[in-house]
Regions:
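Patatin-like phospholipase
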Residues: 1-6, 15-174
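Acidic, glycine-enriched active-site microenvironments
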Residues: 12
């Protein structure tokens, strides 16, 4: 058995590969605060008083000049740190650079390097980072930068990574 995914498939596939059951995944999806996860907000309990006052003033604030504007204009509206934190929490025990073939179910996920347009297949590395890179939808989430690469959602290059599954030895592909 192998699991290969891109975008949301990399998240579900990566978590399933390390042992989460379909019931656990379903429960996780239902209990998440998606408004928080799909934002760059900091939990109120972790904010300073001035941050609380500022966050309660506007529903949405986007800078129109400066470094932060350039980052958002060239990347995505959402940095994705809250999602990255969730992925990190869910993959405890798999934070070191690891061989994804040695997971309980061998796993690979796909991303695209926008610097050169090449498909990047993660067979190893930090699982949560690979998952985050594979779902970095351009314009929505900032790309993930690794070793000079600027990585975005794998679905931009290979939405159905059947070729990757075949390359690692899968015979029956669902």
């Amino acid at each position: 058995d192998y699991i290969v995914g891109t975008s949301m498939g990399s998240i579900i596939g990566g978590l399933y590969a390390i042992g989460y059951t379909p019931q656990q995944l379903d429960s996780m999806v239902k209990k998440q605060d998606w408004t928080f996860l799909l934002s760059d907000r900091i939990k109120r309990s972790q904010q300073t008083m001035s941050e609380r006052e500022k966050s309660e003033t506007f529903v949405l604030s986007l800078p129109l000049t400066g470094k932060r504007f350039k980052e958002q204009a060239s990347g995505g509206v959402i940095k994705g740190q809250n999602l990255a934190n969730l992925f990190s929490d869910l993959t405890v025990g798999y934070h070191d650079s690891i061989d994804f073939n040695k997971l309980p179910i061998p796993f690979a996920c796909v991303s695209e390097n926008v610097v050169n347009g090449k498909e990047i297949v993660f067979h190893d590395g930090v699982l949560s980072t690979a998952m985050r890179a594979s779902m970095a939808i351009p314009g929505v989430f900032t790309p993930v930068r690794i070793d000079g690469m600027v990585l975005v959602d794998g679905g931009m290059k290979n939405n159905y990574p059947v070729n990757v599954a075949k390359a690692i030895g899968a015979e029956i592909i669902i």
